[in-house]
Amino acid sequence: MTMKKLLTLVAALAVTSLTAYQASAEQLQSHLYDITKSGMLKVCIWPQYYAISLRNPDTGKLEGIDIDLSEQLAKDLGVKLEYVETSFSTFIADLQASKCDLGMFGVGATMKRAQAVAFTQPYLISGVYAVVQKGGKIKSWADIDKPGVNVGMPLGSYIEPFMRGYLKNAKVVAVAPPATVQAELMSHRVDVMATDFPASTKMNAQFDWSMTLSPPEPMSVTPYAYVMNQGDQIWLNYVNLFVQNIKLDGRLKAAAEKNKLGPIVAP
């Protein structure tokens, strides 16, 4: 073997070794490695989200599609599950502070949020709806964007920036926890609750005075996905595979139908 060939072989081996080392280092830095090593999956949820991740006020237990599916994810991983409470206005900071490994609470995958966090493929899709009180001054979608009308939505939700751009005459009221838009609507501090399919379903099921208004055309149709810190491709690949599997094996459909979310399951 000539010296030139020997040097070429040594260089190739060095590159191969470096690539293997880098891959090993990336694996050790992944949440997937940390989760399997610790035996614990930490999932961020917003416990006020009906049919998604609600803490039932009567039982104190968590329920909803993402409670069911987070249990399935932990089962697939072979680890225990711990919930970390967050909100739409704080979940990005909570993820970046490593308070949880993953957000599973119907997070709208918007372009702006994607600048700060990573999203999986979607599992639900919803547009914007309006919930009002029967017999009130708001009787149709056309009545909403008028002077003197207060439109409420959760602070930090994807609906907030959309409605700020959409409404030209009505007032936007972004409601911060622990207050809820539902309570603001019931107390007449807002006239309209701008919300999504799960929350509108809850209101109609829970209150006989509740009425849902749909826009003339679908509005701000948004994919809902699971969310994590950027830069962890190994963990993102794993959770994407989980989402793909639950679509194929029927677990997503079953969990959605159980929680009355069948109409908004993502294809």
Please provide the spans of the model-predicted regions:
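Acidic, polar ligand-binding/catalytic clefts
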Residues: 67, 71, 75, 80-145, ...
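Ligand-binding clefts/hinges and TM-proximal coupling segments of bilobed small-molecule sensing domains
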Residues: 26-30, 158-175, 211-215, 244-267
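Short loop->beta-strand "edge-of-pocket" segments that line small-molecule binding or catalytic clefts
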Residues: 39-45, 63, 142-156, 171
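Periplasmic-binding protein-like
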Residues: 124-132, 197, 201-244, 262-267
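Alpha-to-beta junction loops
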Residues: 41-42, 78-80, 96-105, 148-150, ...
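Extended ligand-binding regions for polar small-molecule ligands
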Residues: 26, 67-76, 142, 157, ...
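Ligand-binding cleft/hinge of the Venus flytrap
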Residues: 53-59, 70-79, 159-176, 204-208, ...
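Extracytoplasmic small-molecule ligand-binding "clamshell" domains
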Residues: 26-106, 258
